[in-house]
C-alpha cells in the first residue's frame, strides 16, 4: 500500500545526476478523509536511507504507521523495503517484509532485468514466480531522474511505465506526471544545503494496465526541488489521503568508488 513512498523519496543532483547519499525522516499524518471512510486518524514515520555503491544505488525504507477508525479500531502497519538499482537502469533488486498488527503479511524478494529481449521479473516467496515486463520499463531511480529532466526542459507532461516490485506477482504501472510552473516557498523550513528556494508542483497518477479503468489506483501531489528533494508530498487513495512532511535529513558517506554516473 505504501510502497510508493520509496521511489518518491530519492534525492537527485541535477549536475551530472549525482545522487546525494542521505538519511531522511518523514512524519506521516491524515490529510483528508471522505464521508465514506472509516479512517479518522493516521500517525506514522518513515526512515529512508540511500547509499551509493560501486555499480548502483542501495535504498532502504522502514515504515511504521498507525490507523484509527471511527469504531474505535486501530491497526498498525510495519514495513521494511530494500532495493538496488544499477547506474545503467537495466537491473533492479528488491526485498520486502510487511507486518499488519505484528502478523507478517508479505515476505518476498526478487530481481528484474530489462537488458535483453525477454525482459522479466522474478519473485521468490513460497516458490519462484516469473512476471514478463514490457520493453519500455523504468525502475524508480531512472523514472525520477527523467521527471527532473522533463521539468528542466519546461515540459508539462511526462508518461512512463514503472516497475517497483512492491507486491508479489505485480507487474508494471503506467504513470502520468503533470509538471507545474516552478514556484517559491512561502517560508524557509530547513537551514540545510538540501533546501532550495524554488520547487515544481508535480502530480503523479498511477494506473494498473491490467484493469480497464480510467481512474488511477492512487495519486501523488508533491513539491519537487531542482536537486530532487521532496519537502512534502500527499498520497491520495479512494476515500482518504496521507501527507508526509520531511522532519530531518542528513548526508551520509558514499562508498569509496570512482564516480561512474
Predicted regions and their residues:
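Sec-dependent N-terminal signal peptides
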Residues: 4-13
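N-terminal cleavable signal peptides for secretion/export
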Residues: 17-74
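Short beta-strand segments that buttress and anchor functional surface loops
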Residues: 25-31, 61-66, 94-99, 202-211
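Hydrophobic/aromatic beta-strand elements that line small-molecule binding cavities or substrate pockets
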Residues: 44-50, 78-85, 112, 220-223
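Hydrophobic/aromatic-rich structural module bridging two neighboring secondary-structure elements via a short loop
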Residues: 61-113
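Mature, soluble, non-transmembrane domains
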Residues: 97-261
Amino acid at each position: 500500500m505504501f510502497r510508493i513512498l520509496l521511489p518518491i523519496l530519492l534525492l537527485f543532483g541535477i549536475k551530472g545526476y549525482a545522487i546525494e547519499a542521505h538519511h531522511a525522516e518523514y512524519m506521516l499524518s491524515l490529510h483528508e478523509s471522505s464521508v465514506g471512510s472509516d479512517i479518522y486518524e493516521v500517525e506514522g514515520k518513515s526512515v529512508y536511507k540511500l547509499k551509493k555503491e560501486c555499480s548502483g544505488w542501495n535504498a532502504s525504507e522502514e515504515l511504521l504507521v498507525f490507523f484509527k477508525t471511527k469504531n474505535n479500531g486501530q491497526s498498525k502497519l510495519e514495513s521494511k523495503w530494500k532495493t538496488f538499482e544499477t547506474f545503467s537502469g537495466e537491473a533492479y533488486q528488491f526485498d520486502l517484509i510487511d507486518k499488519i498488527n505484528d502478523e507478517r503479511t508479505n515476505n518476498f524478494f526478487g530481481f528484474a532485468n530489462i537488458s535483453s529481449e525477454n525482459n522479466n521479473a522474478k519473485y521468490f516467496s513460497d516458490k519462484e514466480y516469473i512476471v514478463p515486463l514490457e520493453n519500455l520499463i523504468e525502475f524508480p531511480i531512472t523514472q525520477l531522474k527523467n521527471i527532473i529532466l522533463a521539468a528542466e526542459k519546461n515540459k508539462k507532461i511526462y508518461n512512463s511505465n514503472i516497475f517497483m516490485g512492491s507486491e508479489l506477482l505485480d507487474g508494471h504501472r503506467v504513470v502520468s506526471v503533470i509538471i507545474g510552473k516552478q514556484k517559491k516557498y512561502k517560508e524557509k523550513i530547513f537551514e540545510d544545503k538540501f533546501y532550495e528556494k524554488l520547487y515544481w508542483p508535480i502530480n503523479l497518477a498511477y494506473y494498473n494496465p491490467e484493469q480497464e479503468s480510467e481512474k488511477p489506483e492512487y495519486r501523488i501531489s508533491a513539491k519537487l526541488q531542482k536537486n530532487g528533494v521532496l519537502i512534502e508530498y500527499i498520497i491520495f487513495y479512494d476515500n482518504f489521503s496521507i501527507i508526509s512532511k520531511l522532519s530531518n535529513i542528513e548526508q551520509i558517506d558514499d562508498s569509496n568508488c570512482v564516480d561512474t554516473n
